[in-house]
Amino acid sequence: MKPKFFLIVLPFMLNAVMCYAEKTHIIEPAEFEITYSIKEQPFWDIYIFRCGKKASQYFCQAKLKRNIMLANDDPAYFILSNEEMKDLNTPEYEKKYPLSTGNNDRIYRNLEQGKISTYSTVFGTHYLITEDISIPDWTIYEDSTLTVLGMECKKATTNFRGRYWEAWYTEEIPIGQGPWKLCGLPGMILKANCPKFMLIEAISIKNKNLDPVTFYNYLNYKYAPIERMEYLKKVHKPGIYPTGGNHRTIEIDDN
């Protein structure tokens, strides 16, 4: 993307412009990037948080790699898929293959407009949920600390979108963002735990040789705009999959 064009489209890129088959393109240069490990027993996954001056993104690393392979007709994609199918019912499956709730979601924050956009795929249907950035109601514990990647982090807790979260944030990175939709603390969230569900923890931070904040849509999906509550009711409805059952999401307040 040419720099002049980028400056023109930036205020709009996370709003209506992306509602349909927007192609993969650079949003802006990144200032830092955090890699998070996800533990959702018995599964695991790796996510990337990338942040610039005006936008940030959060996505599953493995899903992005697979989409790139599929878009390029890479034979490795089909080899990997066949191996995964063979391992599906074996003890090795959970150790070898990344998997987590929300791994088909890509989350973008437009920091200027105060908007957050989630691009979600559920059984072949593609949704776009755009909403105001919601700040959890945090309780901060100044005297409860731990160290993550050599940085002192303070504890905070909240009930947000139907789940209880314990988070640890560092004021050494004075940006009130975090993994998934967690945000609004006096520093970057490096660790977040939802007991008996999901543990998220930063395993690396870098600020050099970064990929830019990028809108990814290598498969040129068309995303249908939908309200958040309508989306949750739709995907939580039993029988959304042919085998029965519903789609699991991190947020669960759909009543």
Which positions does each model-derived feature cover?
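Bacterial Sec-dependent N-terminal signal peptides
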Residues: 1-28
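Extended soluble regions of mature proteins
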Residues: 23-255
